[in-house]
Amino acid sequence: MTHGRAWPIPILLLVVVVLTAAPAPAQTRFVFANESPYDTLDPHAAFDVGRVAVRLNLYDGLYRWLDNPAKLEPWLAESHTVSPDGLRYTFKLRKGARFHDGAEVTAEDVRYSIERILALKKGAAALLSTMIAPDTTKALDRSTVQFTLTKPASIFMAVVPEVHVVNAALLKQHEKDNDWGAAWLTSNDAGSGSYMLTRYDPAIGFIARRFAGHFLPWGPKYIDEIEFRLVKEDNTRVLGMIKGDYQGTGGYLPNDQVKRLREAPNVKIVEQESMRIMMFQINNQRPPLNDVHVRRAISYAFDYDGFNKDILGGSVERNPVPIPNNLWGVPRDVKGYTYNIDKAKQELAQAQAKVDRPLTVGYLQGFSQTEQAATVMANGLRKVGLDTRLTSELWPNMVERMKKPETSPDLVVYWISTYYADPNNWIGEMFHSGQWGTFKASSFYKNPKVDELLDVALKSTDRKVRDKAYQEAARIVVDDAAGVWIYNTKYFGPWAKNLEGIRFSPIGNGQEMRWVYYAK
């Protein structure tokens, strides 16, 4: 028989005291049910709200939009200066910021990041490439980076947060065939954000744990692990919130689902004013939609009040122009189109183009409001005498379709969210012909006068000049019926009742998790 060695009594007592006095802290976990898939983790490959959680939680930029109304705050940069001619922006990086592998964040990483964005020609590249040319950004020293613009741009600072900084040395290790590490970064992490990736499956979502070494000090309470999971159906997300399987989900649910969540004892609804326009883009380049009278007929065929007031219960505000009502640049005298079948038929009678085929109306899988809107549009068009064919896609797939006039549906309904708080985020990116190839510009609208006005607004730093130019451009776009603008939304964010620290911003929709914690 063998005997284990007996521990002396004092040591046993010491072990008991240590184990009872210092228990390991419980790990806190948060699961967000997202409407659309995370098909890539590359922060430079996507520029939409559906995948914003990746950019906000795994990565940092020089500045960040915070709170509501949104304010631009220093982030990786501690300060910046602008040259008198408005062309050179010089940023001083804060000391102590590190990537998830421990490497220091330097000016060279910032320079590499903007060059990578411009080279990949994805995500925010369509916007940034109008202001910055390749090989013009300089790392003056380890903590100073300078951007030289091709021309003065009033929105440059507003879009600086979209320059998400990646670990240049790490990506260079994973480059293949000069791809800037794109294949590797699709499913990996090269950031410095508040959370670091632990697991990723494009069919499911991603999991990340708290990065204790983040440059921004953590408070006494925080969430240790976050998961952003694809859950396609509204009803499944709502039921999961009620059961406690999920602790957060998107804040733009149908009114009946919001009502269900309000009645759940373990859920709270965070209400916030927002800037998010729901609209149909009309493919202006495809016959017969290249006839303005056909487009006006479509605009008169949608039952705005029936959708906004009856289906959505008055939880949104009619927005008849391509700029949110609660922002400057809006022509207040423009009332837009109303639901009027007689006027729709009159416009159709004036059209030179004949509508001799069904019109395809696209909507987004997992976003039931878009299906409801597509159905309302189809019903209205049927009363005018036009046939339709409804088609749906997951958001990333629809984005790809909307990049070309040949593949985009005749009409497609979705939201234009806030990526930066400036009218250019809406009318400039939707209706300047230089933006073709992006999902925002899927109307494929081209009007030289509108391009000229939008260029004036983009270059000027005088708010009065910009306001006047945006108003005039909006009047023309509405008269041309380039799209169908339905409403400006309000955010009704479902969160677990015991969650605190939620900092909603219309830029990101409250999906930045570093301040969030469980109250008990």
Residue ranges of predicted features:
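Surface-exposed binding/hinge segments that line
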Residues: 5-7, 92, 127-174, 199
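Periplasmic binding protein-like
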Residues: 32, 102, 247-248, 253, ...
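N-terminal lobe/hinge region of extracytoplasmic solute-binding protein
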Residues: 33-84, 115, 190-192
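Gly/Pro-rich hinge or "lid" segments in bacterial periplasmic/extracellular proteins
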Residues: 66-67, 163-220, 225, 233, ...
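Append "and occasionally in soluble cytosolic enzymes with long acidic Gly/Pro-rich linkers
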Residues: 207-212, 263, 289-379, 383-384, ...
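Ligand-site clamp/hinge motif
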Residues: 213-259, 387
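Extracytoplasmic/peripheral linker and loop segments enriched in polar/acidic and small residues
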Residues: 293, 387-399, 428-496
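Long beta-strand-rich cores associated with HINT superfamily self-processing modules
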Residues: 493-520
